[in-house]
């Protein structure tokens, strides 16, 4: 059975760099499933208030990072803030075509047209276009669509493409050479296209 191109799995959280560094560390250590569960639920390495929240957020971050390889995980764990956040961003794009296509089709167009901002209404228009492209896309309630928008716009603030979460002003971002080298060496053409929308 065909899978929908667009899913709501990005709604579980923004890039969460400090926590993603911890998850990348566990992946690099090659922990067993039991060791993973112990670290997340017993040691509470993410410092969450409930085991359920810790499990849910760690699962999202793990699924994101596992779309890439150990070289990128090392950038996340050990890199500078800029390199690490861009490495997590690259993994998030590969993990979620809902995020990737928004960058490629909407954010890129705003930069190309020299428009100064990214109004929230563009997200609603984008979701309508997604449904036209993908008949299998789930029909989401308004609350879910708004939550997804919150998450995507927060990610764009974290990476620097949006400088002000109130006015949604756009800013060009230069992706670090380390991240770009990894993406080129691993032939991540979709991610390369989506991550460089301000060029």
From Swiss-Prot:
BREX systems (bacteriophage exclusion) provide immunity against bacteriophage. Part of a type 1 BREX system which protects against dsDNA phage. This system allows phage adsorption but prevents phage DNA replication, without degradation of the phage DNA. Methylation of bacterial DNA by PglX guides self/non-self discrimination. It holds the Pfam family BrxA. Belongs to the BrxA family. This is BREX protein BrxA. GO terms for biological process: defense response to virus. Gene3D superfamilies: uncharacterized protein from magnetospirillum magneticum domain (1.10.3540.10). Keywords: Antiviral defense.
């Amino acid at each position: 059975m065909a899978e929908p191109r667009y899913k709501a799995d990005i709604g579980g959280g923004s890039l969460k760099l400090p926590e993603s560094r911890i998850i990348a560390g566990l992946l690099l250590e090659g922990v067993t499933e039991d060791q993973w569960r112990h670290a997340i639920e017993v040691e509470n390495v993410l410092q969450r208030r409930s085991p359920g929240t810790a499990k849910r957020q760690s699962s999202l971050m793990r699924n994101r990072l596992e779309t890439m390889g150990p070289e990128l995980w090392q950038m996340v764990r050990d890199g500078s803030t800029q390199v690490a956040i861009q490495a997590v961003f690259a993994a998030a794009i590969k993990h979620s075509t809902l995020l990737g296509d928004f960058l490629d089709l909407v954010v890129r167009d705003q930069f190309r047209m020299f428009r100064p901002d990214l109004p929230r209404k563009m997200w609603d228009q984008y979701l309508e276009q997604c449904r036209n492209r993908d008949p299998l896309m789930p029909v989401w309630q308004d609350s879910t669509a708004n939550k997804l928008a919150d998450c995507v716009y927060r990610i764009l603030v974290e990476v620097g493409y949006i400088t002000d979460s109130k006015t949604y002003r756009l800013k060009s971002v230069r992706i670090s050479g380390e991240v770009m080298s990894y993406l080129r060496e691993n032939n991540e053409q979709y991610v390369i296209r989506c991550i460089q929308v301000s060029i």
